Amino acid sequence: IPLRLVGSEMCIRDSKQAIQWMVADSEMELRAARLLTYQAAWNGDRGQDIKVDASMAKVYATEVATRVLDRSMQILGGMGMTHELPLERWYREMRIRRVGEGPSEVQRMVIARDLLSGKR
């Protein structure tokens, strides 16, 4: 994570607990998203139907990525919105990914139908 200067000190180090929590939350969410994705891939490799697993991974990973980008922009302040860093472009691209291959709401319908079908 790039560090931002606040006065004469780095933003993430030492007593900047709120920033540290944002970094920790981002890492935890990214790892969870990665695990959902790996589970879908693993089940697919075993020949299982992965429609629900893939929907869960897609919804969670894209929403986590959006939150992580938002936090990163918050941490970096005004620099997060400049063209000098790729964050603003990544944010736009991630927003598009949330609607590609079905928006998150459609993916949630796929998940809910499966859960409520009584087949699990």
Regions found by a protein language model. Give the residues of each.
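Generic recognition of well-ordered alpha-helical segments
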Residues: 32, 39, 71, 95, ...
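Charge-rich, acidic-biased intrinsically disordered regions
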Residues: 14-15, 19, 51-59, 80-96
